[in-house]
Amino acid sequence: MNLSLINPFRLSHLTVPLWFFVFVPYKLGEALLITLLPLFIVQTVNGSVTDVGRVHSLTSLAGVIAFIVWGNLSDRLKLRRPFLILGFCGFALCTALTAIAQGIEQVMIFCTLGAFFMAAITPVASALVIDGNPEDRWASAFGRFYQISGWSFVGGVLLGASWLAFIPIHWTSMGLRSLLLLASCAATVSLILCWKWVKEPRKSSEHRHYQPELQDVISVAVIERRAMFYSSRMLYFILHPSWRVNLLHNLSRPLLLYYACAAVFFFAVNVVFVPFPIFLTTHLGATNTQVLLITMGKAAIEAFFYLPMARFVQKRKGVQLQAWATAIRVAVFLIFSLVAVMPVHPLSLPLVGMAHLLTGLTWAAISISSTTIVATLAPKGQEAIAMGSYNSLIGIATIIGSLVGGMMAVSYGYSACFITGAILMGVTATRLFWIGRMPNLILQKQGNPIK
């Protein structure tokens, strides 16, 4: 069964498979868990910012490992539905256990297990999109799926903010626990819908091939906060055992330089944003509702600009676009640093909130252009391997950056995190501008300049 929708960006009717909407309740729950977890750790189980970093690091590690395990297993067995059911069940159970956890150790265990099962959902959903559509429709199908997922995430954050706004202050801990239980219930709804609406595809592809049409629509993640929480992104291929050998034999200098820039970028992002929600509440005195509204504003911008940015990237040089987007983040992180070192003013929180919205716009540019850049810099025939390696690199940078961000905030203060992020973003932007000016012969593949 399909539904006819109107795409707000092209004002044309689209036919959307009903099973796409199986993920809407799950994405609502995922948004609640990801955005509330730092607050829950500090305010409910009396953890520290360091603990927030440790939990982020463990969930990312679990996601990196499980993403490869579940994706390969699903392709080998040529089964999709059982892995979705496993993912929804695991998320629902582990989130419910997190909601009733009594200490940081329990939160770490349940969140790590939850991330391991959550990672089953992403590659299998990707496989379903591929299995259910001809190759010439993959790009549009992924674009629609991403849109639905992104706006569902925004809806989840809005739901959390609305709930907390009506709860008395002295019920904050109970409110956070109830929202995590709601997230568990939402995943259970997805489980039921999956059982009813998702059918095994008639054809299941064991090997997924790179399609150039996809590089301008597949991103790291529509929502940056989701990309930070765990690093299993929507990939349309699975790495096979020979990928490391093939990559080492075909590495190009520009691709190596871009990998280095990406590693520094995602390390810096986590150093800044892992302690960011706690900075808002403890230093600026923001309420939990205000924290969620700030998060929602950024997520809404990311979801809104996803498809327009994909079309924009097709007509521009991806390296230059990402360099400018990264440079904007230098200014944003410097604003965060300035607010952190100065006495708190009534305008401090609005200023940080407005600056945070800019990072949403830059993420739309960065996440889309990064896939295009990697695919273009990779040797011909090695694009899928290059992007798989890029995804692994993001995971490693996230794991380390989360740990460092939490420890740095406790040891040296939030300003140290923000200044470090600004410096590293500045270095990254400089190197990206330099890569963009490299001779065309280096940046060309089969006579086509980098986009």
Identify the residue ranges that each predicted region occupies.
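Helix-to-loop junctions at the C-terminal end of transmembrane segments
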Residues: A66-L79, L164, F305-G318, A409
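Juxtamembrane intracellular "pre-TM" segments in multi-pass secondary transporters
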Residues: M1-H13, E200-Y259, I450-K451
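Hydrophobic core of transmembrane alpha-helices in multi-pass small-molecule transporters
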Residues: V24, C94, E105-I121, A263, ...
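Intracellular juxtamembrane helix-capping segments at the cytosolic ends
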Residues: A120-N133, A365-A378
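Structural signature of the two symmetry-related core transmembrane helices
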Residues: P82-L97, Q320-F336
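Glycine-rich segments within core transmembrane alpha-helices of 12-TM secondary carriers
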Residues: F142-A161, N391-G401
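Central cavity-lining transmembrane alpha-helices of secondary-active solute carriers
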Residues: R54-N72, M296-P308
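Helix-loop boundary and gating motifs at the non-cytosolic
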Residues: N2-S60, V64, P254-T295
